[in-house]
């Protein structure tokens, strides 16, 4: 199992089990601008878990412990279907591209301000490069990008980021997206190699939400 960078800062007996929650240790909802809440708001952006690692995770298991009455859905986008749907001339452009993924970049672009990473954290989680298009064991292909994707290798930074934004807009169109409305006790498992996901915004300062997460280590990217 993977241990999230944020989990390393929490004194828990089982660090591989990570609570994504707006409820503090004292049982009260944390303030909107507190680090715990700011971190959660970062998950409102499309992303795939741990793509900032040299070997990203395989899948994520998310269990709903407590959910708000309205909002707080998780949206999933099918990156295989999105890639399959793009024109052949666009496939020729993107097939050979490599993307630099960076934990420092995604933290810096969080909707709220997170504390700066220490030198030890920067050394532990350096930028890493992955193919923009992943090829799976069955031969299918999918986009691999999201919130940790900083820029495209060998391309001017702004130009690469514009292309990534365009591809993200294409691949998260309604026809590629499933919205899961949570009920307490739900367990959803997804393949991070071929999906993006994000939290649908909700009243994070007014309603409790406790989600328990486990992330499974992956294998080298092809």
Where are these regions (language model features)?
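Fe(II)/2-oxoglutarate oxygenase catalytic core
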Residues: 1-189, 193-222
């Amino acid at each position: 199992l993977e241990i999230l960078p944020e989990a390393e800062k929490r004194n828990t007996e089982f660090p591989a089990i990570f609570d994504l929650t707006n409820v503090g240790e004292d049982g009260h909802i944390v303030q909107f601008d507190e680090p715990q809440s700011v971190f959660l708001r970062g998950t409102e952006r499309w992303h795939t878990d741990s793509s900032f690692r040299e070997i990203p995770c395989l899948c994520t298991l998310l269990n709903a412990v407590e959910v708000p009455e309205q909002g707080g859905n998780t949206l999933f986008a099918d990156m295989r279907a999105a890639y399959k749907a793009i024109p052949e001339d666009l496939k020729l452009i993107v097939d050979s591209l490599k993307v630099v993924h960076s934990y420092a970049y995604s933290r810096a672009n969080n909707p709220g301000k997170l504390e700066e990473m220490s030198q030890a954290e920067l050394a532990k989680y350096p930028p890493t490069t992955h193919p923009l298009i992943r090829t799976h064991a069955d031969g299918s292909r999918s986009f691999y990008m999201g919130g940790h994707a900083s820029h495209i290798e060998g391309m001017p930074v702004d130009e690469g980021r514009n292309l990534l934004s365009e591809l993200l807009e294409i691949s998260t169109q309604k026809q590629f997206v499933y919205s899961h409305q949570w009920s307490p006790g739900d367990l959803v498992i997804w393949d991070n190699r071929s999906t993006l996901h994000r939290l649908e915004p909700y009243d994070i300062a007014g309603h409790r939400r406790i989600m328990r997460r486990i992330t499974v280590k992956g294998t080298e990217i092809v």
